[in-house]
C-alpha cells in the first residue's frame, strides 16, 4: 500500500492555490426576438454601440443600426436562415473593419474584403475601419495634377484632376461603365492604383469587366470589390466603403488612387431597403432622411493630400443611373451637389452613334484647366466654343433652307469636330495623341475630307506620327508644352499624311 505523505499533498494544494486566477469576462448578450428579410430585432444588448458588429449563435455577423428603447435593430450580413428566434446574440465590441495590404492588387474581393476569385487567401497584417473620417481642410491641397482618362472629349473639355470627384451620370445602356473602365485602362504605367467597386450588378457583367482588365494587363494595379445583385442589401450598402478603405490605405502611403463606384443608385436602393425594413421614416422617393449623408461621407473621403501628408490622392468617379434622362430626381441631384462636376451621357447621342455619348453642353468639371497640362490647354481652348456654336447652328439650320457660305463652313467644321471626339471602347489615347488629334480638327485640316473619312484619317495620322515623327510625342511628354518645334513637326506630319491619304482614297 502506497504511503500518503501529508507534506507532498500540502505542497500540491499550495501550488494549485497560488496558480489560481479568477478571470471575469463580461459579455454583452441579447436574445433574438424576431428575424427575417435580412433584419433581426434583439432584446437586451444594452451597451451596444451604433454600427457595432454583433455575433449570432451560428457565427454569422450583423451590424447594430437601430438603437431603440426596448430593442436593437440589426442588419444581417448573410441570409440569416440558420438564426432562430430566442437564440443568443453577443456584442463584439468592434466596428466593421477590413484587412488591407499590397496583396489585394490584382484580386477580386467582396464587401468584407474576402477573396472571391478562387486564388487563395490574401496576406494582410494591417486593418482599416470601413467607415473612417475624411481628411480635414488643413490635410488637403487644391487639385492640380491631371488624371488622364484617355477619352478626348473628357480630357480636353471636362478635365479631371487627381483628388477630384467627377460624377458619371446617364440612363442605362449609355456607356457609363465603359467610360470608367477605359479610365482604368489608361492608368497603365502612370503609377496609379485603381479600385473598381461593382454594386448590385449582374455577376456576368462584373466577370466581363475583370476579363477586360486581365487581357489588357490592368488587373495588376487594380482591386475589384464586387457585390452582385443577389447579395444581401447590407453588403451592397457596405461595398463602396470597403473600396474607399482599400484606396485610402494606398493614398496615405503617398500613392495616387482612382476609385470607381458602379453605381451609387443601387447602393441607395439597398440602403432604402434596409431603412424601410428597420421602420425608419421614409422621405422623398421613400429614401430615408440621411441618404444624402450616405453619399457625402463616402465621396468626401476622396482628396488630394497636403505635402505634409505625402501628396497622395484619391480620385472618385461615382456612377449614377437616371430614368429617362431625369437629372432632377433625388439621388442624381444629391450626388451632383456633392461632386466637383459631372459627365452627362445621353441616350440620344448613343443611339445616333456618337460614342462615348458625352453631352458636352451640360457636362462640367469644377476643377477645370487646373487639371490639364499646358499643351492640352493650348489646343483645347477653341474646341468647346466651336462645338457649342455648332450645336446652336445645327438647331437653327433645321429650319433655314438657304445658308450663307460661312455658316455652311461652320456646320461642316462642327460635324468633323464631333467625328473627332468619337472613340472605340477600350482604346484610350495618350495625351500627346489627343493634342495632335484636336490640333488637326480645330485648325481646319480635316475640312478637305469627307465626314465618314475623318475617323480613319485620324487613326492613320496617329500611327504615322508614332512611326515617322516620334520626336513629337517626346517633346509633349518631356516639356508638357505644345512648343513651336512640336507644332512644326505636327504640321509637317499632317501635310505629308494628308497627301498620302487622299492618294489612297482616290484609288
UniProtKB/Swiss-Prot annotation:
Annotated disulfide bonds: none
Question: InterPro entries from the entry?
Answer: ATP_synth_asu-like_sf, ATP_synth_asu_C, ATP_synth_asu_C_sf, ATP_synth_F1_a_nt-bd_dom, ATP_synth_F1_asu, ATPase_a/bsu_AS, ATPase_F1/V1/A1_a/bsu_N, ATPase_F1/V1/A1_a/bsu_N_sf
**UniProt keyword annotations, A-Z:** ATP synthesis, ATP-binding, CF(1), Chloroplast, Hydrogen ion transport, Ion transport, Membrane, Nucleotide-binding, Plastid, Thylakoid, Translocase, Transport
Reactions catalysed, as given in the entry: ATP + H2O + 4 H(+)(in) = ADP + phosphate + 5 H(+)(out)
Q: Where does ATP bind?
A: 170-177
Tell me the protein's name: ATP synthase subunit alpha, chloroplastic
Q: Which gene encodes it?
A: atpA
Can you tell me where the transmembrane regions are? none
Q: What membrane topology does this protein have? A: Peripheral membrane protein
Its annotated function is as follows: Produces ATP from ADP in the presence of a proton gradient across the membrane. The alpha chain is a regulatory subunit.
Q: Which domain of life is it from?
A: Eukaryota
